[in-house]
From Swiss-Prot:
Disulfide bonds: C37-C73, C69-C128, C178-C211, C252-C263
Gene this chain is encoded by: D7L1
Protein name: Long form salivary protein D7L1
GO MF: odorant binding; toxin activity
Keywords: Disulfide bond, Hemostasis impairing toxin, Platelet aggregation inhibiting toxin, Secreted, Signal, Toxin, Vasoactive, Vasodilator
GO biological process, one term: vasodilation
Family the entry assigns: Belongs to the PBP/GOBP family.
Top-rank lineage group of the source organism: Eukaryota
CDD domains: PBP_GOBP (cd23992)
GO cellular component: extracellular space
Pfam families: PBP_GOBP
Protein role: Modulates blood feeding of female mosquitoes on vertebrate species by binding and sequestering different mediators involved in the host response. Binds leukotriene C4 and U-46619, a stable analog of thromboxane A2. Inhibits agonist-induced platelet aggregation. Exhibits vasodilating activity.
Signal sequence bounds: 1-21
Amino acid sequence: MIVTGVLLFILLELFAQGSQAFKALDPEEAWYVYERCHEDHLPSGPNRETYLKTWKFWKLEPNDAVTHCYVKCTLAGLQMYDEKTNTFKPETVPVQHEAYKSFTEVESSKVNELQQALSSLNAGSGSCAEVFNAYLPVHNKYVGVSRKIYHGTVDSVAKIYEAKPEIKKQEESFFAYCAKKALGANGKEGYTKLRDYELADSAEFRNAMDCVFRGFRYMDDSGLKVDEVVRDFNLINKSDLEPEVRSVLASCTGTQAYDYYSCLLNSPVKEDFRNAFYFHELRSANYGYLAMGKVYEGPEKVKEELKKLNY
């Protein structure tokens, strides 16, 4: 009986962990996936805009290596494909549907068909090309369904934002969003402190910084994502600081967002960290910033653009 009880407990734990892994994406999270995959896979050169326009209309063209890797990136971000196990994840489709079905108005029968279609796919070696070729027929048949489920239509997204004001809005920076979320009535004052990089060791300020770090994708439930922090230094043309940034973060005694934030602000890279953080704040109000071909033009230009953002 004891063994049976232990086995049941383990199975329940595994089920709970699996359920937690498939949390439905809200519009902000889906938008981030699309734009980050644009950033990572759009080619430079004259064809960049053509790729971007085509993908934004949910057309997986042209059928080439660039589009193949963009599709794999997007499927992984939307939790429809798992890179670690190299398998498609049909079980996540109804989870996403159930969370927003009152807004998307997609027929459950169509969702079931999409789920069944995904369940029959084989990712092969897991290469971009094999994942793309496996998924393309499913996409072509069910693009109308998946586009609604995964927040690809303007009308349904607008309804969700109206009904759920707790979701970060487009054109709202994560500094502004997190100040309001974590500091409530003191949001304006807290926003100023966040923008001015003042250290305020309070529970509210710590919560605000945790919100910002998660919004910037510096952290998730598994901990700090050092590569994401380093990436922001690279984007302000400070890739030479990578060893020092990694060293600062590795030697930080705490493990919370506020701790890492404080360590960076009290390190030799503090000024560059401020610049990187400012630049990410600007981009957090428009996830398509880099995909549109914009680049870092220095701290003064960033501050000038930040002034245009509404708190």
